[in-house]
Amino acid sequence: MPVIVNLDVMLARRKVRSKELAEAIGITESNLSLLKSGRVKGVRFGTLAAICRYLECEPGDILGYERSDDDLKAAD
């Protein structure tokens, strides 16, 4: 998948535990774990905004994009 989730990196930088973040933004630890691992098909903007607010970061600090040849073929 070309979208890279760096949430675990940001949590470590901010010294915040997953449980703390999940409680603060109102989602389950299980859902946060799925998001951290990239095993989700999408994330709501509201959830992303809440994460960024709590961790004092930007969406680009959490999400990245890695281009691949397959992406170019799919665009054709």
Task: Give the residues covered by each predicted segment.
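DNA major-groove recognition helix of helix-turn-helix/homeodomain DNA-binding modules
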Residues: 46-61
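Residues within the helices of the helix-turn-helix
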Residues: 8, 19, 49
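DNA major-groove recognition helix of helix-turn-helix
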Residues: 36, 55, 66
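Short, charged recognition helix plus adjacent turn
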Residues: 9, 63-76
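Short alpha-helical DNA-recognition segment
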Residues: 16-34
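A short, Lys/Arg-rich alpha-helix, primarily the initiator
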Residues: 1-16
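The alpha-helix within a helix-turn-helix
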Residues: 11, 22, 52
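Amphipathic, hydrophobic secondary-structure cores in small proteins
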Residues: 31-49
